[in-house]
Every structure is written in structure tokens, then in C-alpha cells.
UniProtKB/Swiss-Prot annotation:
InterPro entries tied to this protein: Ribosomal_uL11, Ribosomal_uL11_bac-typ, Ribosomal_uL11_C, Ribosomal_uL11_C_sf, Ribosomal_uL11_N, Ribosomal_uL11_N_sf
Name this polypeptide is given: Large ribosomal subunit protein uL11
Residue ranges the record marks as coiled coil: none
The UniProt record lists the keyword Ribonucleoprotein: yes
UniProtKB keywords: Methylation, Ribonucleoprotein, Ribosomal protein, RNA-binding, rRNA-binding
Function: Forms part of the ribosomal stalk which helps the ribosome interact with GTP-bound translation factors.
SUPFAM superfamilies: Ribosomal L11/L12e N-terminal domain (SSF54747), Ribosomal protein L11, C-terminal domain (SSF46906)
Gene Ontology biological process: translation
Family affiliation: Belongs to the universal ribosomal protein uL11 family.
Assembly, per entry: Part of the ribosomal stalk of the 50S ribosomal subunit. Interacts with L10 and the large rRNA to form the base of the stalk. L10 forms an elongated spine to which L12 dimers bind in a sequential fashion forming a multimeric L10(L12)X complex.
Annotated source species: Methylorubrum extorquens (strain PA1)
GO cellular component: cytosolic large ribosomal subunit
Length: 149
């Protein structure tokens, strides 16, 4: 018989840097899950990734206090900032204050958008790479990036 699911926890955790402090500890603790077990398993799975890359994770909590987790691709904004060369670190660079109106914060090519779309395809809610490129193009514009051919 399958285990009974008691809930889901969605978090965005830096690769290789899961620890019991907030937001992980309180989110898992209130469901009665073993926080250190998750941290060790997550850090082991993300050991080969670039340290600090934000990884969206969905944790499924079961009635017997066990859990499973599924990792997604990093957010589109992370890939866009990386492609353009905006600072990614302790204090991430923000996009334009007035997207589409004021000065742009960088330029991105259609080829770079397609590359990002192919990476993100499993996580996006679209059927074709062209539709994924259109979604990512919209995110780029909203961040204040200029899309060039």
C-alpha cells in the first residue's frame, strides 16, 4: 500500500548549502521531518553543481514522517543574469527599475534565449521550444534586458 501524503513543502535552496537554519529548518520541522537527513541528501545530490546556484525543490512529506524530494532547474532569472553577466552573489543585481521604458541593464541574444529554453524545458508549462523561448523572452524584457538578434 502506498504511503499517505501529508503535504508538500516548496523551497529554493542554494546548491550544496542546505543547513538547518531558516527557511529549511522551520519548514521541515513543522511537518515533523528529519531536517539533517534532508540537508545531507540535498547537499550530496547537488555536490557536482556550481555552489550557490538556487535550486527549487519540492519536498513530499508522508504520514510516517519520511519524505522524498524532487529538484527542478534553477529559475529563469538566474540563467538570464548569468548569460548577461549581471552579478550573482550575496547581493544579487536587480533588473531595470522601469522595464521597457528606461535604460536596459544588458543585452541577450536569441541564441542565448534558446539555450536557456532548452535547459528549462522540463520545468516549463509549454509544448515546444519556441513557446519556451517566448516565455523566457518575456522574463528577459521584464528584467530590463534588451533582446537582440
Amino acid at each position: 500500500m502506498a504511503k499517505k501524503i501529508t503535504g508538500y513543502v516548496k523551497l529554493q535552496v542554494p546548491a550544496g548549502a542546505a543547513n538547518p537554519s531558516p527557511p529549511i529548518g522551520p519548514a521541515l520541522g513543522q511537518r515533523g521531518l528529519n531536517i539533517m537527513e534532508f540537508c545531507k541528501a540535498f547537499n550530496a545530490k547537488t555536490a557536482q553543481m556550481e555552489k550557490g546556484t538556487p535550486i527549487p525543490v519540492i519536498i513530499t512529506a508522508y504520514q510516517d514522517r519520511s519524505f522524498t524530494f524532487e529538484m527542478k532547474q534553477p529559475p529563469v532569472t538566474f540563467f538570464l543574469k548569468k548569460a548577461v553577466g549581471l552579478k550573482i552573489g550575496k547581493k544579487p543585481a536587480s533588473g531595470s527599475k522601469t522595464p521597457g521604458k528606461g535604460p536596459t541593464v544588458g543585452k541577450i541574444t536569441e541564441a542565448q534565449l534558446r539555450e536557456i529554453a532548452e535547459k528549462k524545458m522540463p520545468d516549463l508549462n509549454c509544448d515546444s521550444v519556441d513557446a519556451a523561448v517566448a516565455m523566457i523572452r518575456g522574463s528577459a524584457r521584464a528584467m530590463g534586458l534588451e533582446v537582440v538578434a
